From Swiss-Prot:
Gene: rplJ
InterPro entries linked to this entry: Ribosomal_uL10, Ribosomal_uL10-like_sf, Ribosomal_uL10_bac, Ribosomal_uL10_bac_type, Ribosomal_uL10_CS_bac
Similarity section: Belongs to the universal ribosomal protein uL10 family.
NCBIfam families, per database record: PRK00099.1-1
Function: Forms part of the ribosomal stalk, playing a central role in the interaction of the ribosome with GTP-bound translation factors.
Species this chain originates from: Cereibacter sphaeroides (strain ATCC 17023 / DSM 158 / JCM 6121 / CCUG 31486 / LMG 2827 / NBRC 12203 / NCIMB 8253 / ATH 2.4.1.)
GO terms for biological process, alphabetical: translation
Quaternary state and interactors: Part of the ribosomal stalk of the 50S ribosomal subunit. The N-terminus interacts with L11 and the large rRNA to form the base of the stalk. The C-terminus forms an elongated spine to which L12 dimers bind in a sequential fashion forming a multimeric L10(L12)X complex.
Source organism superkingdom: Bacteria
HAMAP family registered for this protein in UniProt: Ribosomal_uL10
MF annotations from Gene Ontology: large ribosomal subunit rRNA binding; structural constituent of ribosome
PROSITE patterns according to UniProt: RIBOSOMAL_L10 (PS01109)
GO cellular component, one term: large ribosomal subunit
Pfam families: Ribosomal_L10
Protein name per the record: Large ribosomal subunit protein uL10
Length: 171
């Protein structure tokens, strides 16, 4: 790789580190090409990506960024999984690590917070943005549906009583 290509890679990595909600770093020694393609496909499904880059270039790209300390994780054969959604890449990486013992999560970064492997698992256990929105909407909508049910209950009770009275008179 010549100098211009290296500069381009450093620039791309810098953009990844700045724009990603989470970056997960893992060792991938011993993983086959097919397994790596499977990981990439799973990441794409959730809007994330996987990148293998030279550790030295990644450390240069991290210089001056809030997640600069993540450079300590970049040793050996490392892969970076990232996504704009702070939970998506962590969920996929954690699930993949459970299925494949050769994929070992080293840690990651979420903004300026450096995550250890347990931190990545904690982030992976969190609900996604869409799930959180759904929970909030259901919490907001629950009182309204309860009120509507309470208002509608007397009318349905009266209708039930009237139908029972009609049945008694008919019998």
């Amino acid at each position: 790789m010549d100098r211009a290509q290296k500069e381009k890679v450093v620039e791309e990595l810098g953009q990844i580190f700045e724009s990603s909600g989470v970056v997960v770093v893992a060792h991938y020694a011993g993983i086959t090409v097919a397994q790596m393609q499977d990981l990439r496909a799973q990441m794409r499904e959730v809007g994330g990506s996987v990148r293998v880059a030279k550790n030295r270039l990644a450390k240069i790209a991290l210089a001056g960024k809030p997640s600069e300390k993540m450079g300590d994780l970049l040793t050996g054969m490392t892969v970076m999984a990232y996504s704009e959604d702070p939970v998506a890449a962590a969920k996929v990486a954690d699930a993949y690590a459970k299925k494949n013992d050769k994929f070992v999560i080293l840690g990651g970064a979420m903004g300026d917070t450096i995550l250890d492997p347990a931190g990545v698992k904690t982030v992976a256990a969190m609900p996604s943005r869409e799930e959180l929105i759904a929970q909030i909407v259901s919490c907001i909508g629950a009182p309204a549906s309860n009120i509507a049910g309470a208002i509608g209950a007397p009318a349905s009770n009266i209708a039930g009583i009237l139908s029972t009275l009609e049945e008694r008179e008919a019998a």
